[in-house]
Amino acid sequence: MTDFNHPPRILFLYGSLRERSYSRLLAEEAGRIITTMGAETKFFDPRELPLRGQVLDSHPKVQELLELSQWSEGQVWSSPEMHGNITGILKNQIDWIPLEIGSIRPTQGRTLAVMQVSGGSQSFNAVNTMRILGRWMRMFTIPNQSSVAKAYQEFHEDGTMKDSPYRDRVVDVMEELYKFTLLLRDKVDYLTDRHSERKAKVNTDG
């Protein structure tokens, strides 16, 4: 039987390689917030992750990503909005995570929070895309979300987020993710048990 006495395990993915990446700064701020609530957090660094299909999935960076996804009980995806959508940097990370690895499903039943940053006015195109991807990855995406407009104005020089309604929303999102993860993590097997898969297994075994 799985032991759920450990803190909720939250993996952060972000979608920019810039030195002062606002999607990374937003993810790091969210990580600090949810850590104070009691979660354990890990971040995947997308630098040196090859393009999907460029190398075998035995590549060390791919294996690191897959192991982190399997370790996680919840995830946070943070992306800039680029041409009305998420960046290729984030999409490449998601594309490397398969729906199945043998009998293991690296994302099924995980909770998911989505966040985006914009250089201009507030937009929701990136978070909407991430919600669609979360559904395809069989994840439980929480209702709340964060969209930070003019992100270059919202962070101190040290990378921490300024006190503002945008930061308040990030706190709300992390609080909701923490609660949903606690509520769902020991019920994933029950919630993801499907008639069609049971039927297919009977036909295969029979």
Swiss-Prot record:
One of its GO terms (molecular function) is NAD(P)H dehydrogenase (quinone) activity. The keyword Nucleotide-binding applies. Homotetramer. Pfam families: FMN_red. This is NADPH-dependent quinone reductase ArsH. InterPro entries: Arsenate-R_ArsH, Flavoprotein-like_sf, FMN_Rdtase-like_dom. Its cofactor is FMN. Coiled coil: none annotated. It catalyses: a quinone + NADH + H(+) = a quinol + NAD(+); a quinone + NADPH + H(+) = a quinol + NADP(+). One of its GO terms (biological process) is response to metal ion. Has high NADPH-dependent quinone reductase activity with a preference for quinones with hydrophobic substituents. Also reduces CrO4(2-) and Fe(3+). Somewhat active with NADH. May be involved in response to oxidative stress caused by arsenic. Inhibited by NADP(+) and weakly by dicoumarol. The gene is arsH. Keywords: Flavoprotein, FMN, NADP, Nucleotide-binding, Oxidoreductase. Belongs to the ArsH family. Disruption phenotype: No visible phenotype. Sensitive to the oxidizing agent menadione in the presence of arsenite ion. Decreased arsenic and chromium accumulation. GO terms for cellular component: cytosol. Induction: By arsenite and arsenate ions, but not by CrO4(2-) or Fe(3+). FMN binds at residues 16-23. Its EC number is 1.6.5.2. It comes from the Bacteria.
